[in-house]
Amino acid sequence: MNVCVMGLGNIGLPVVQHVSKVYRQTQGYDISLEAVNAVKKKGIDASTELACADIYVIAVNTWHRNGYSDMSAIEDCTKQALKLNPDALICFESTLAKGTARKLAEKYNSSNMAVCPHRWWKQEEDKYGVIQLRVLGALNQESQKKALDFYNTLGIPIHVVSSLEIAELSKLVENTYYYLRIAYAEDLKLLCEDNRVSFEELREAVNTKWNVDMAEARDGIGGECLPKDIQILIDTYPNMPLLHGAISTDKNYRAKIAHNPFGSKPETQQIEENNNSNNKSHGT
């Protein structure tokens, strides 16, 4: 069984490292020679030229640019892979806009596709690495069986959902949920500051309840995933005022802390995942 991991950046690098430990015939692919050389230094086959494979794991970055979800890299990888092997299983681990996988299956006449969004946290890779519970949705029963066999062989536990779309949405919704939690904390922190109330003491107090886990409010919601994913979800469902409000809250919070009102350090520390012990995230 030949496996090719397409995209060797933040998503693909840990994936290709893990896959290569299980499948001897594993190759990493990236258009960046620097990324390819980094993988080669780890003793893993990698190239800027795509090879034929039985399974392609697509792990390239997706973007939200100029007000639109940009899935062009996903489509390019899919097109290249199916050109080399029309019967290959395509496993999308990248974050996708709802409907992306099905549209590509129809456009390129593929009957073997699955969506299994990655979950990985760089800050605690030993605990929250590649091997953790994943959501998987497939195009059909045959694709589901092939994908389950693949991930079971990798030792990755799977929660199966009924469709590609549910799997796509699950990634967007979980990251948006985390965005909302941080935005609420940011808004509350500003309110506390205006009313001379200790936000940290209040947060510590409310987090003593078993079903409350209030996020930290630090230096704004940054990183590669959270700001992008909430925008992609809004593209799908634009009539969600709560999401628009959260983005506005974070923008307002950033503007306020730019003048250092909380006595924080002048350098900005962006938040993608919160590493507070009371507020664990499973990464992107």
How would you label these PLM feature ranges?
Residues M1-A51, Q270-N279:
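NAD(P)+-binding Rossmann beta1-loop-alpha1 motif at the extreme N-terminus of oxidoreductases
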Residues N2, C52, K145, E193-T284:
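NAD(P)-dependent Rossmann-like dehydrogenase/reductase catalytic/cofactor-binding core
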Residues Y29, Y68-E75, K98, Q141, ...:
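Electropositive phosphate-/nucleotide-binding environments in soluble metabolic enzymes
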Residues A51-C52, I131:
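Alpha-helix C-terminal capping/helix-to-coil transition sites in glycosyltransferase folds
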Residues C52-I55, W63-E124:
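Rossmann-like NAD(P)(H) cofactor-binding subdomain of soluble oxidoreductases
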